[in-house]
Amino acid sequence: MAEPWGNELASAAARGDLEQLTSLLQNNVNVNAQNGFGRTALQVMKLGNPEIARRLLLRGANPNLKDGTGFAVIHDAARAGFLDTVQALLEFQADVNIEDNEGNLPLHLAAKEGHLPVVEFLMKHTACNVGHRNHKGDTAFDLARFYGRNEVISLMEANGVGGATSLQ
């Protein structure tokens, strides 16, 4: 059910309208208010605009809320390859090991889509569970291999991931 200001706040975030977003936040609206589709402003924000994320997070937006499809914002940002947004979310305690409804971590989604900078950051600068298997039994390495993401495969192999740690 939509909450007061949920639609306006979500709309401003989705458009990347910092001016309207700031105005609404200054009026102390509930930053975790849901819009008519049951999603928060953080969940519908323009992913390529980490400043939107930071403003919402500074006001207490919960980076680990999942939407109706089981995705947290970090899943969406990793899948879309928005490294700056992933970093902003992690600055505010987004869970790097949060699972979606299929058991995928953000690393799985970034590897599947071939987003090398996101994969590299998650592997080298977070406590990401690189060997985690989703509900189908696949690791991020398995998905990178299945989808032919050769740069991701090379990076993972260079960091000791793959081979015996993944399905053959």
From Swiss-Prot:
InterPro entries recorded: Ank_Repeat/CDKN_Inhibitor (IPR050776), Ankyrin_rpt (IPR002110), Ankyrin_rpt-contain_sf (IPR036770)
Gene3D superfamilies in alphabetical order: Ankyrin repeat-containing domain (1.25.40.20)
Cystines in this chain: none
Superkingdom: Eukaryota
CC annotations in GO: cytoplasm; nucleus
Name of the protein described by the UniProt record: Cyclin-dependent kinase 4 inhibitor C
Function: Interacts strongly with CDK6, weakly with CDK4. Inhibits cell growth and proliferation with a correlated dependence on endogenous retinoblastoma protein RB.
An annotated GO BP: cell population proliferation
ANK repeat residues: 4-33, 37-65, 69-98, 102-132, 136-165
GO molecular function list: cyclin-dependent protein serine/threonine kinase inhibitor activity; protein kinase binding
Keyword annotations of the record: ANK repeat, Cell cycle, Repeat
Entry keyword annotation includes Phosphoprotein: no
SMART domains documented for this protein: ANK
Family as reported in the entry's similarity comment: Belongs to the CDKN2 cyclin-dependent kinase inhibitor family.
Assembly and oligomerization: Heterodimer of p18 with CDK6.
